[in-house]
Amino acid sequence: MKNFSLWCDFIENSFLDNEFLNLLSHGINGATSNPAIFKNAILNSPIYKDKILKLKGKRTKDIYEELAISDIQKAADKLAPLFYQKNDGFISIEIDPRLHDNTTLSLGEAKRLYSAISKENVMIKIPATKASYEVMYELMKNGISVNATLIFSLEQSQKCFEALNAGLVEFRKNNIALKEQNTRTPQAVISIFVSRFDRLLNPKAKEQNRIGILNANLAYNNIYSKNEPNIRALFASTGVKGDDLPKDYYIKELLFENSVNTAPLDAIEAFKGKMDFKKPLMNFEIYTELNQIISQSEREKACNDLLSDGIEQFCIAFEDILKAL
């Protein structure tokens, strides 16, 4: 089994200088952030207070971006050896989630953030909404790596792949002299959210804590079958709430070839590199099991509800940061 990568779903300034380095020495190959993670870091960590005071008088979004960009740049530097040696070592930052339904503004923000950060191993996170597929295409076409996020349905994962791959094809066409130019091919991950499915549907399901795994397996099969190593499935929302499951449950159940799992710190600590790789189920096996657990209509409704809820949660977290600044 090859090309499995475990990333850390957490970022905070002082953490990057301490615990993060320890994680890197123990096999962590990347990191992700989102508005909720930055909200918790900026509003709860004292290290940001002096920085915020020095930035007073600026627009609140500008203050947020200076803080976030500084952390992302620091993480990118820590991860740079992995990027240049293994073509991994990415850190992700999300565009303003309030732009999720505006293609033009999303694309402009994504390019601006990438330019401001100015690190090759940064992925720009784009939510998988109808307005965003064109954004994913344009970023990949222009050599900017992408983390397509908030994927819940097979349809979303397919549309993400089509957009990302089309951009990748255009990038390659425009960079025929790739080796001479020393230009790196952009990478992409398609972030399939897992545990949120189970938390929503467990009360209606005939078997607990399986729907998220099966749904993620289905999306993974679709992505993996395309045989494009520069576009990987990433399993997100892999934290466990409560004590009914092992903290690393959603890591161990989704140890698949050419995939990424971004996990919270407690899940990483519980996992400790136990690489017992899984053989993905085939699609007919997945559908057979899913149909025994819950109806297709319930699953489809859950996909739509979870996407809407995920966007709303990130928008609220983003606005909470701005209000506090």
Curated annotation (Swiss-Prot):
Annotated catalytic residues: 125
Superkingdom of origin organism: Bacteria
One Gene Ontology term of the molecular function aspect: transaldolase activity
CDD domains, per the entry: Transaldolase_like
The protein's annotated pathway: Carbohydrate degradation; pentose phosphate pathway; D-glyceraldehyde 3-phosphate and beta-D-fructose 6-phosphate from D-ribose 5-phosphate and D-xylulose 5-phosphate (non-oxidative stage): step 2/3
Any one Gene Ontology BP term: carbohydrate metabolic process
Signal sequence range: none
Keyword field contains Ribosomal protein: no
Catalytic activity from the UniProt record: D-sedoheptulose 7-phosphate + D-glyceraldehyde 3-phosphate = D-erythrose 4-phosphate + beta-D-fructose 6-phosphate
Keywords in alphabetical order: Cytoplasm, Pentose shunt, Schiff base, Transferase
Purpose of the protein: Transaldolase is important for the balance of metabolites in the pentose-phosphate pathway.
Name the UniProt record assigns to this protein: Transaldolase
UniProt organism field: Campylobacter jejuni subsp. jejuni serotype O:6 (strain 81116 / NCTC 11828)
